[in-house]
């Protein structure tokens, strides 16, 4: 089980990866908007870190299924998912 500090480190790493995609002008506009919404959801303190991470993982997984998604974006999204999967409470 990860400690609270480790969970926050994983969360910050995932947020960094997602923020890079959200601010990259070569990322499709609809993906940037969706990622921006997910970032806000991760930062909101309404639910526990693990619940926020699981909700984000689900949404990111749905986004990676889009066949029109550029491969570099898909790879970065998988990286964020992999980081978020390490969060445990």
Set out the residue ranges of the language-model regions:
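Peripheral, non-catalytic segments of secretory and membrane proteins
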Residues: 1-89
